[in-house]
Amino acid sequence: MSIFSARLASSVARNLPKAANQVACKAAYPAASLAARKLHVASTQRSAEISNILEERILGVAPKADLEETGRVLSIGDGIARVYGLNNIQADEMVEFSSGLKGMALNLEPDNVGVVVFGNDKLIKQGDIVKRTGAIVDVPVGDELLGRVVDALGNAIDGKGAINTKDRFRVGIKAPGIIPRVSVREPMQTGIKAVDSLVPIGRGQRELIIGDRQTGKTALAIDTIINQKRFNEAQDESKKLYCIYVAIGQKRSTVAQIVKRLTDSGAMGYSVIVSATASDAAPLQYLAPYSGCAMGEYFRDKGKHALIIYDDLSKQAVAYRQMSLLLRRPPGREAYPGDVFYLHSRLLERAAKMSPAMGGGSLTALPVIETQAGDVSAYIPTNVISITDGQIFLETELFYKGIRPAINVGLSVSRVGSAAQTKAMKQVAGSMKLELAQYREVAAFAQFGSDLDAATQQLLNRGVRLTELLKQGQYVPMAIEDQVAVIYCGVRGHLDKMDPAKITKFEKEFLQHIKTSEQALLDTIAKDGAISEASDAKLKDIVAKFMSTFQG
C-alpha cells in the first residue's frame, strides 16, 4: 500500500467516533487503496498524453534563429552618420535606421562606419540603432516601370500607386567585358538634322552633350526621346528603343514640365523618369544615375534596346564631392576626390552593344555636362570627354544668333557613329561637314576683304544656306527620309541662289509637297536605307519642279 493510501485511510478513521474507530479502519483501508490506484493510473495516462503533445509541438517548431547585427549612431550631420558596431558590413550595403530611413555604407573604418543617409537626417539622432540589411543597394527593374516617375531608390513618386516588379538589379553592376560586346553598327536616330547628318549616334554608343546653361542640352535629349515614338509604335521589337531619363539636381518644376511634354507627345509610354531633384539629399543625387542605368540594363540584357540620358553628370559630381568631403576623404583638383574619374567611367562603360550570343541588346548613353562660360578644359568636362565616344558641343553665341540647335559643328564629333549611319544619309551628308568646315575658315577672313574670288564666294554662299538648313524647331524631330530629302536640296546646290531668310519656309513647303505627292519615294529611301540612281534622278526632278513653282 502506498503512503498516500495509508494517509487517506487514517484521515477517514480520525473523523469517525472512537467506538467505531477500529472497525472503520479495517473497512476503510481496502476502499482507500482502490481509489488511490485508480487515481494513480489516470494521472499516469494524462502525463503520457501531455508528454506526447509537448513532443509533437517541439518537433513541429522550425529551428530558426532570428539574429540581427546592429550598431549605434555615434554622430549625425549633413547627411552623414558615423555608426559604431557594424563590424561585418560590406561596402555599398544598405542599412536601416530605427526611424525607418535607409542609408548606404561608404566608408569602412577600423572603429566606425561612414553611412550616407537617403533622406532627411533630422529624423536620426545620436544613439539610434542601425540595422544591417545584408543587401547591396538595388532597385526594381522591368516593363512595369515604363510610363512612371520614380526616385533614386525606384519608389514611385507620381501618385499612381506602388510599382510591383518581378526583378531587382543591383545599382553597381560591373560593366560588360570585351568579349560580350560588338562594335556599334545600328543607327540611333535623334530626329535632329544637325546630329543625324554630322555627328551620327549608334546604338550602344556614349555621346556627350556639353554646353553652358540655357543652350538647349535638355531640349536635344527630349527631342531624341520623342523621335523614338515612330519606332516604338511599330511591332518590330528590334527597332523599338526604351528610354530612361535621369534628372539629377534639377528643379522639380523642370521635371514636371518634362513629364508633361513627354505625356503630351505620347512618349511617356516607353519611358521611365528617375528623379533626384535639387531638394533631394546628395546621396540620392549620387545614386540616381546608377539606378537608371540598372533599369536600362534590364532591357539590354533581354536583347532589347534602351537609351539613357543623364541630365546632368556635373551635378552628380558635385553631390559626390560633397559626400566625400563630409566623409573626410582627401580632396584633389577642384576639391573633387581622387576617384571622381572612376565615378563616371564605371557608369558610362555600362552602355554597350552586346554580341548576338549575349542577346544582341544595347544600351546607349547620352550624358549631359554643363560648362561654365564655355570652359571645356575644366576637370569634369575633360574627364567625361575622354570617357565618351564623341561629343555634341552647344554654344551660347550660336544660340543667341538664332542658330538652334546651337551645335558647333567644328568641335562636335562622333568617333564611332559613322559606322552606324544609314547609307542614304552618308550619300547626302558626306560632303556637308567639309563644306561647313571650309565655310567657317573662310568666313573669318571674308569680313576683312571685299574682293573675293568666285570659288570663295560660292563657298560662303553654300555655307550660309547649309547653316540655315540645319536649323530646327524644338519638339519637331524629323524622320530620316525627310532629313535626307531636305539636305539633298542643300548639298546639291539647289538652294545656292535662294534668299537664306526663305529657306525655313522652303523646307516646310517642300516636305509638305513631297509627302502628299511623292510619298512612295520617301518610303523607298526609308526601306532601302540608300539612294539608288533611279531615286536620285527622281528626287532631282522633284526638287527642280518644286523650285520652279516655289514663291518664297
Swiss-Prot record:
GO terms for cellular component: mitochondrial inner membrane; mitochondrion; proton-transporting ATP synthase complex. Keywords: ATP synthesis, ATP-binding, CF(1), Hydrogen ion transport, Ion transport, Membrane, Mitochondrion, Mitochondrion inner membrane, Nucleotide-binding, Transit peptide, Transport. It comes from Drosophila melanogaster (Fruit fly). Belongs to the ATPase alpha/beta chains family. It comes from the Eukaryota. ATP binds at residues 211-218. Residues 1-47 form a transit peptide. Mitochondrial membrane ATP synthase (F(1)F(0) ATP synthase or Complex V) produces ATP from ADP in the presence of a proton gradient across the membrane which is generated by electron transport complexes of the respiratory chain. F-type ATPases consist of two structural domains, F(1) - containing the extramembraneous catalytic core, and F(0) - containing the membrane proton channel, linked together by a central stalk and a peripheral stalk. During catalysis, ATP synthesis in the catalytic domain of F(1) is coupled via a rotary mechanism of the central stalk subunits to proton translocation. GO terms for biological process: electron transport chain; lipid storage; proton motive force-driven ATP synthesis. The keyword Ligase does not apply. Its main location: mitochondrion. F-type ATPases have 2 components, CF(1) - the catalytic core - and CF(0) - the membrane proton channel. CF(1) has five subunits: alpha(3), beta(3), gamma(1), delta(1), epsilon(1). CF(0) has three main subunits: a, b and c. This is ATP synthase subunit alpha, mitochondrial. It is found in: Mitochondrion inner membrane.
